[in-house]
Amino acid sequence: MMQKIQRFGGAMFTPVLLFAFSGIVIGVCTVFQSDVIMGSIAASDTTWFKVWYVVKEAAWTIFRQVNLLFVISLPIGLAKKQNARACMESFVLYCTFNYALAALLSNWGSFVGIDYAIEAGSGTGLASVASIKTLDTGMVGALIVAGVAVWLHNRYFDTKL
């Protein structure tokens, strides 16, 4: 049991390593965009500001797509064979899950108190995952789907058809 917990912890640690680097880049960009620190060179209409804005937006990728990051990286540590294939299976299953939730919400969202017509955002119960407007399941949904995908992969990978 302890080995399984350690494998899960190792699989969760892989994407977390990227958080530190991305956070540092965001912090540096924020400093370089501050006119209080940098002076007039950091005014919002200058090329200096716009270049650092581009770099900062790129650095936000890790935090904006954290669900996908965990869905793809969890099978790296937990799949017993063919890790890359397990990652692809996990990603496809997660996208399928979100498309199915989106279809359910577009038809019957009002029954559960979700207005699917509004924009996805904070406090709405909706999120945009891989450009799919869906129910905001957060990290829990990503980890559950990735866990199911890895379990299915490990159980049925060697099964002959």
What feature does the model see in each segment?
Residues 2-160:
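Early transmembrane hairpin of solute transport permeases
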